[in-house]
From Swiss-Prot:
InterPro entries: NA-bd_OB-fold, Ribosomal_uS17, Ribosomal_uS17_bact/chlr, Ribosomal_uS17_CS. It comes from Trichlorobacter lovleyi (strain ATCC BAA-1151 / DSM 17278 / SZ) (Geobacter lovleyi). Pfam families: Ribosomal_S17 (PF00366). One of the primary rRNA binding proteins, it binds specifically to the 5'-end of 16S ribosomal RNA. This is Small ribosomal subunit protein uS17.
Length: 85
């Protein structure tokens, strides 16, 4: 099989690494308020598959969309961009 097509990627910070092969990643984005034209920080947390348990809390990571791995996991770890330590 060839390339699976374009998959969405996100960049975020690991906030929890207490599960086996799973980390929680917070992805922040800026949204402009329609009336006041002020930018507001919004964030969403994703459960991300980490096969090697290599992430620690505070790491900056890149994640990629994948097939559903469990009830909540639809993202996988692509790479660690910055280590917290």
């Amino acid at each position: 099989m060839g390339e699976l097509g374009h998959r969405r990627t996100q960049t975020g910070v690991v906030v929890s690494d207490k599960m086996e092969k799973t980390v929680v990643v917070r992805v922040d984005r800026l949204v402009k308020h329609p009336l006041y034209n002020k930018y507001i920080k919004r964030s969403v947390k994703y459960k991300v598959h980490d096969e090697k348990n290599s992430c620690k809390a505070g790491d900056k990571v890149q994640i990629v969309e994948c097939r559903p791995l469990s009830k909540d996991k639809r993202w996988a770890l692509r790479q660690i961009l910055e280590s917290a330590a």
